[in-house]
C-alpha cells in the first residue's frame, strides 16, 4: 500500500494546506513521507490514518489530532542509533515548521494545539499518554483516539496485515521472506511489547478492535519466534 492514487494525493495536499494555513508545508510532508526507505510509513499511511479518524473531525480538539497525524512519522530513520530519536525529532518538527511557515495569526490561534500535538507525537513512542492528560478529559479523549487510530492496522484483515508486516521488514532493509536473526528478535520484542499493553486500544471507539488485534499480534509473534 505504498503507492497512492492521484486523487488521494490531491486530497492530502488540500488537507495539509488547510490544516497549516499555508502551501509551504505540503512539499516538506510529501518529500519526507516519500523517502526511499519507507514502505509502510508513507503518504498511504497518512491517508489510511485519516480514514480511520474521519468520524472524529467534529471533535473539539480535531486540530490537535490533525497536526499530530501530519507530524507523527515525519522523521523515520531505520538505522541505529538514529531511529531512537524518530518521535522526538518528529515532535520537534511540528513546532519548528509552524514557527517557520505559518502566519502570525495562525500561530496565535493554534499555539496551544501545536504544543499538545508535540506531546502526542512524543507519545507514539510508548503509545501511552502523558500523565498530565488525565486531568483534561478533552485532551485525553483526543490523544486516545489519535494513538488508537495509529494502531488500528493491527486489526487489519489477514492480507493487509501481511502486507504491513512485510513493509516493516523492507523498511529495515530486510528480505521479508528471510529476515536476519537480529531483525526477527527485535521485531518479536516490539510485537510482544504491544501485545502486553492493557488496554491495547484506550478509547471506547477503538476498543472493539482489541480481540482481532490481539489475535493478529499472536500470529505475528509466533512467526518471529
PLM features per residue range, with description:
Residues 2-7, 11-15, 34-41, 51-62, ...:
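Divalent metal-dependent phosphate-bond-processing catalytic cores, especially two-metal-ion Mg2+/Mn2+ enzymes
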Residues 13-32, 45:
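Short alpha-helical hairpin
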Residues 24, 60-64, 85, 112-116:
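Alpha-helix N-cap and coil->helix boundary residues
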Residues 33, 37, 73-79, 98, ...:
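Short amphipathic alpha-helical interaction patches enriched in hydrophobic/aromatic residues
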Residues 41-44, 85:
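Aromatic- and histidine-enriched alpha-helix N-cap/loop-to-helix transition segments
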Residues 49, 85-100:
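An active-site-proximal "capping" alpha-helix that borders the catalytic cofactor pocket
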Residues 49, 62-79, 90, 117-125:
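His-Asp-centered metal-binding catalytic motifs of divalent-metal-dependent phosphohydrolases/nucleases
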Residues 93, 97-149:
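Charged mid-protein connector segments
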Amino acid at each position: 500500500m505504498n503507492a497512492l492514487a492521484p486523487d488521494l494525493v490531491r486530497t492530502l495536499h488540500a488537507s495539509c494546506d488547510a490544516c497549516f494555513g499555508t502551501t509551504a508545508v505540503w512539499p516538506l510532508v510529501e518529500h519526507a513521507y516519500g523517502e526511499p526507505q519507507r514502505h509502510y510509513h508513507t503518504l498511504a499511511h497518512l491517508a489510511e490514518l485519516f480514514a480511520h479518524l474521519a468520524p472524529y473531525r467534529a471533535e473539539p480538539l480535531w486540530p490537535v489530532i490533525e497536526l499530530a497525524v501530519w507530524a507523527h512519522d515525519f522523521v523515520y530513520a531505520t538505522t541505529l542509533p538514529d531511529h531512537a530519536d524518530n518521535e522526538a525529532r518528529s515532535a520537534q518538527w511540528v513546532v519548528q515548521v509552524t514557527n517557520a511557515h505559518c502566519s502570525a495569526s495562525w500561530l496565535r490561534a493554534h499555539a496551544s494545539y501545536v504544543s499538545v500535538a508535540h506531546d502526542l507525537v512524543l507519545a507514539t513512542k510508548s503509545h501511552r499518554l502523558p500523565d498530565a492528560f488525565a486531568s483534561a478529559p478533552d485532551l485525553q479523549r483526543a490523544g486516545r483516539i489519535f494513538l488508537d487510530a495509529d494502531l488500528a492496522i493491527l486489526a487489519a484483515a489477514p492480507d493487509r496485515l501481511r502486507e504491513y508486516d512485510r513493509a516493516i521488514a523492507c523498511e529495515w532493509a530486510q528480505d521479508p521472506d528471510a529476515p536476519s536473526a537480529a531483525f526477527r528478535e527485535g521485531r518479536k520484542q516490539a510485537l510482544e511489547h504491544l501485545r502486553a499493553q492493557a488496554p491495547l486500544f484506550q478509547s471506547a471507539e477503538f476498543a472493539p478492535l482489541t480481540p482481532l488485534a490481539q489475535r493478529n499480534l499472536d500470529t505475528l509473534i509466533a512467526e518471529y519466534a
